[in-house]
């Protein structure tokens, strides 16, 4: 796979993707394009100038994505731009015949989601989206236990995710622009994906409550809860913590079925250590983690390289986005929002 990155103006994804791609078997990480954005702004947000980034990964630097794709004969591009520009860039890049990976937030409107799905079909490319917490070892252990029937068909799920705070983003970072979706979409992505994946069901209705309790400089919520009624009658909830300036477990979970409860919970004083456990008729026991799982941010690479079915498609991302937007609408209006089937 011959791959490049389109866009360097971001705090996290250019480095995360660069580290994940560099030296990976079957992958040639060849270039990055600034998309004509101001170099000073890129360095302010990324912490590296475009030239420093190119030197770090020993890649070529371009201004325009089209030149990068053509000159380097790329077959795949990672898109790192403002979320509100994703659809525009997918339509441009799809015409060049490259596959595309879009780090969340996928899009900020239903219309943009449709545009990406249509571009993928029109030009015969593949669009993958991520990351997905389903590939984290504890979540993979939960899924394995569900598939083994250890608790029967689940009917209730509670997920809690602690994601730090907005403090890491500078005041002039475009992430703070409400037009780009904020944590309502970027964090909602994780929990909704897990609800669909672990419950094996679709969402019927959504109710959400968001608030800003500890982040006076932020235009967004910093703590929220999404409650989802599933089509088959079960329920799932997702607590988003973007407010804790303390050490706290990144992930906690309970999923309930007729034969027991599977949980991810804190183990001891170490705030980062959690265990996966089963409470059933035989009592309590810890469940082992899988020896190996796909990387939760880079799983799509092998899927592209090996031509496998994509775990997180553009159409699936469209559905997750619709649920995220419905939750945001619910939080703003105080009403339950029904999802169209």
Task: Report the location of each language-model feature.
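Contiguous beta-strand/loop segments that form the cofactor/metal-binding neighborhood of enzyme cores
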Residues: 186, 192-269, 297-309
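Short acidic low-complexity segments
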Residues: 60-70
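Predominantly a Rossmann-like dinucleotide-binding segment in NAD(P)-dependent oxidoreductases
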Residues: 9, 133-218, 334
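Active-site loop of classical SDR/Rossmann-like NAD(P)-dependent oxidoreductases
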Residues: 40-44, 286-298
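C-terminal helix-rich "cap/oligomerization" subdomain common to oxidoreductases
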Residues: 26, 76-79, 303-341
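Beta-strand-loop-alpha-helix segment that lines the small-molecule cofactor/substrate pocket
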Residues: 75-76, 82-83, 87-134, 149
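N-terminal Rossmann-like dinucleotide-binding module
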Residues: 1-53
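Hydrophobic residues in well-ordered beta-strands that form the structural core
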Residues: 63, 102, 127-129, 238, ...
